[in-house]
Amino acid sequence: MNRTVVSGAVESSFSLTDAVGTEALNMQRSSGINNNMRIPTSPMSFSSNSVNIPGSLVLDGSAASMQHLPQQQQQQLLQQQTGQGSVPMRENNYSHVDKKPRLEVKQEDMLQQQILQQLIQRQDPTGRNPQMQALLQQQRLRQHQQMLQSMSPSQRLQLQQQQQLRQQLQQQGTQQIPPNVRPYEVGVCARKLMMYLYHLQQRPAENCITYWRKFVAEYFSPRAKQRLCLSQYESAGHHALGMFPQAAPDMWQCDLCGTKSGKGFEATFDVLARLIEIKFASGIIDELLYLDHPRENRFPNGLMMLEYRKAVQETVHEQFRVVREGHLRIIFSQDLKILSWEFCARRHEELLLRRLIAPQVNQLLQVAQKCQSTISESGSEGVSQQDLQSNSNMVLGAGRQLAKFMELQSLNDLGYPKRYIRTLQISEVVKSMKDLMNFTGEQKIGPIEGLKRLLEQTVTVKLQKQKMQEMEQFGNNGAINGPVQAQMVLTSGTMNGSTGNNTNNHHQIVGRGAMSGPAEGQMVISSGTVSGATANNNSNNHNQIVGRGAMNGSAQAAAALTNYQSMLMRQNAMNNPNSNTGKQEGFSSQNPTPNSNQSPSSSSQQRHNLVTGGFPNSPQMQQQQRTMNGPTNILPQNHPHQLQSPHSHGNTPEQQMLHQLLQEMSENGGSVQQQQAFSGQSGSNSNAERNTTASTSNISGGGRAPSRNNSFKAASNNNLHFSEDISITDHDFSEDGFFNNNDIYGGL
């Protein structure tokens, strides 16, 4: 009886397989492509449903065939299958010993579940029918209860723990993913690429640009870029560098191979449709892609990367094929649109069809054999000149014909169609001129006039950026690089006071330092404004600039100082638009005498301000002024005097650096040459005078370069060419626009 049941089931199954075998084979491909991948049968019918891709690509043949069978045949098939599974065992069979309890599933339950699944698939392909989902959920719960009843208590506990752990992991995964990022499915990028290749092959025969524009809009993001790297080609010529071979290495770099040779092309979203259309219009019949094992990664921002370390791209032409091997990397957005397509080609091979080359080779062989037979019959001396000439012409003709056939007219050295590469080069030119096109369209002017205006605006913007960078560089106390390296410490101070109805403004800039050739020095520049008062009714403006130090062969340091002065001029002009332009500037190399109308306290205050800096009405500045001790002594002209370093504790690092330098000068016994400039005028008229004296000393080069400490000593000890340096400094500063501009002192 058992044998009869088994044989009957097998025979019926074989008969059923024979009856629907062809249909099942046909449905494997159609269901795998159309149902699972949801690729439309028509190439023109793109839809957004292609984003949702199920797990598998190919269905089983029996499952695919059962979906299209009548219900009665499905019931018979299920009964036969369950009959095969429930064959009774003989009495002498001991397989039931020491085995786990087996779950006995009734045939009715299996049939009911199968019917429910079929109804769900037919009525609602997306699985959102609530009634069917409720029935299916009840069926699953009943099966789960039956399974729990058949288990032992230990197995039940273990199953419950596994279910709890699975739920916790799922909750953690959903919490980590942002709400705007869709859940990640393994293999979704690879399946999206398969859909891309399918629609690439199922293009219309007329190769219209409308289809390719719709194709690009479906699979590429508006910010997409397609990059082709040819850096690993040894024989790549200049045509692989695009239209800008000199600027290409600095602007183009491959992220896959890490080289910066500039051999490659980049196409944006705007030209992708035209590029694909030209590719297939240049003789390419089909394009195939053979891929290795994929590597998928998901980034925290939702982007997904699909990488193939080994990818083979084959382009099929009418008479030959081009096989190209390389590295492929594709980056997808959150909505599965291609953001970046990068292909780094390593090498390529051009394969010709044997059936097309064989006739040409045979013809050449026949001509060569004929020449050989002619020579062997007549001998080397008996061959006439006419026969020899005819034979040679035949050989040359056959060889040229073969060479012409072997030469691929439409391809270049890289294996790409010449028209395709030319289009890539044109796209780079258009990309570089996109700003000009937009500018001419907005201004409604011609291309030549637009190019002139755009160039002027570009130059203006560059100059403004350069000025801002210079101001930031000097404002941030940056170091000046060159043969003379100087560190600038900037301090600014303002002290206001009044004893009467009139004001007396003094602008003093003191520079101390030592610069000699490649030596490294430090320059301390302090600028301050001191307001005093006299009993006179006249308003006297005194602007004094005192320079101390040694500058020997330091053209770059002088240029840096000039730039800094120009920067101060621009800053004060911007901050004080209503500046007083009535002030006059003057530069004198002689030592003036103090003004008789100026009080000693004012003169002492001027000398005191040479080493102090602060802000207007600042409590810190007042405290510094009270705590200063050891004022400088007034000595006769052309005699050095000793400057005592103040012991005030400034809150800024610039003031601390200045105090430290002065303290080192006093400790090392260094002396500096001091020249004071005072100017004044009595009467009822308002005058603006600016008297500046500068004293410099040369440091003889030789021996070791002066350091920060001994540079001040050298500056004070060597005073050999004092008058010559004064004239040189006078000429340098008189030509500078900083001292000829009256706007800088307007707001002080």
Curated annotation (Swiss-Prot):
It is found in: Nucleus. This is Probable transcriptional regulator SLK1. It comes from Arabidopsis thaliana. The keyword Nucleus applies. It comes from the Eukaryota. Keywords: Developmental protein, Differentiation, Flowering, Nucleus, Transcription, Transcription regulation. One of its GO terms (biological process) is cell differentiation. One of its GO terms (cellular component) is nucleus. A motif (Nuclear localization signal) lies at residues 213-227. Disruption phenotype: No visible phenotype under normal growth conditions, but the double mutants seu and slk1 are short in stature, sterile and display strong disruptions of floral development and high frequency of female gametophyte disruption. Enhanced tolerance to salt and osmotic stress conditions. InterPro entries: LIM-bd/SEUSS. Transmembrane segments: none annotated. Residues 67-93, 138-163, 572-653, 667-712 are annotated as: Disordered. Probable transcription regulator that functions in the development of the carpel margin meristem similarly to SEUSS (SEU). In association with SEU, supports organ development from meristematic regions by facilitating auxin response and thus organ initiation, and by sustaining meristematic potential through the maintenance of PHABULOSA expression. DNA-binding adapter subunit of the SEU-SLK1 transcriptional corepressor of abiotic stress (e.g. salt and osmotic stress) response genes. Residues 71-81, 588-606, 667-686 have a biased composition (Low complexity). Expressed in young flower meristems, ovules and the carpel margin meristem. Residues 572-587, 615-653, 687-699 have a biased composition (Polar residues). Belongs to the adn1/SEU family. Forms corepressor complexes with LUH; LUH is the transcription repressor subunit and SLK1 the specific DNA-binding adapters. PANTHER family: LIM DOMAIN-BINDING PROTEIN. Its main location: nucleus. Residues 204-451 are annotated as: Dimerization. The keyword Transcription regulation applies.
